[in-house]
From Swiss-Prot:
Gene3D superfamilies: 3.30.70.330. One of its GO terms (cellular component) is ribosome. This is Small ribosomal subunit protein eS24. PANTHER family: 40S RIBOSOMAL PROTEIN S24 (PTHR10496). InterPro entries: Nucleotide-bd_a/b_plait_sf, Ribosomal_eS24, Ribosomal_eS24_CS, Ribosomal_uL23/eL15/eS24_sf. GO terms for molecular function: structural constituent of ribosome. The keyword Ribosomal protein applies. SUPFAM superfamilies: Ribosomal proteins S24e, L23 and L15e. One of its GO terms (biological process) is translation. Keywords: Ribonucleoprotein, Ribosomal protein.
Length: 102
């Protein structure tokens, strides 16, 4: 899986960078978590700071376009993002599991 950054736009008010990217893959569309981890590695960020919002693969193509938001810290992501986006990206899931266990 190859990731190419198509564009970045800083949003200092929300302490994040909006990123548009393209993925070239050999098999099926990669999972949101594998894209998040690969994108975080490419941007030299922690995977908890990256929230993948959209993955769009055209029928029969081995290319996927997507959008992600890269925050300055996981706390900023948890404060700004909707709960369902945090669940999809498995951000803060370990904390919630620990609270439920107690």
């Amino acid at each position: 899986m190859e990731i190419e950054i198509l564009g970045q736009e800083d949003n200092p008010l929300l302490h994040r960078t909006d990123v548009q990217f393209k993925i070239v893959h050999d098999d099926a569309t990669p999972s949101r978590l594998s894209v998040r981890d690969s994108l975080a590695a490419k941007l030299d960020k922690d995977s908890e700071e990256v929230v993948v919002h959209e993955l769009d693969t055209k029928f029969g193509m081995r290319k996927t376009r997507g959008r992600a938001k890269v925050y300055d810290s996981p706390a900023q992501a948890a404060e700004v993002e909707h709960d369902h986006m945090l669940e999809r990206n498995k951000i803060g899931a370990d904390d919630a599991d620990a609270e439920e266990a107690e």
